[in-house]
């Protein structure tokens, strides 16, 4: 087993899946799309300490610093349920799905509700998750347990089954990682 000390770097990359033409919608807001991808690919100060809560906190700081509204309510009426998206800017809603895989339905419904009826807050949702490979590397190389978290592969597999319930375009972004070995001295 490799350790973080034996690596020169862990390189982040993104896998993407466009549901209901989400990428085309985001391309009409190209600066916003590029900003999201830049935030997700920005180097992590210490990837060895990148637990789920630490990664959530890092993304919170990065998005808020770029003007994204944090934890906007899905419903406007205070008497309505307290559902919240993670981030909102320029009619793009972001949900970070680093939690348990069982939250997929709740997360997707937030996008649907925020896009329809009187709410009409978003044109597209961006669902940020990690890949199965990311979770495997984090556990085997860095001893960070991401087991049980939702994966990009699962969202990509499940989302088409929700086609009658989820009408809003959703851009699924899977954060992946590659090991970059050190060169012998």
Name what the model sees in each region:
Residues 91, 98-100, 176:
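Short, flexible loop/turn elements at secondary-structure junctions
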Residues 83-93, 118:
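Active-site beta-strand-loop-beta-strand hairpin of nuclease catalytic cores
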Residues 96-110:
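Active-site-adjacent loop/helix micro-motif of nuclease/hydrolase catalytic cores
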Residues 108-115, 156:
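Short, well-ordered amphipathic alpha-helices
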Residues 114-121, 161-165:
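Arginine/glycine-rich "motif VI" loop of SF2 helicases in the C-terminal RecA-like domain
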Residues 120-131:
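Conserved beta-strand signature within the Rossmann-like core of class I S-adenosyl-L-methionine
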Residues 131-185:
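Domain-level recognition of nuclease-like catalytic cores that cleave nucleotide substrates
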Residues 1-77:
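Acidic-basic catalytic patches of nuclease active cores, encompassing PD-(D/E)XK
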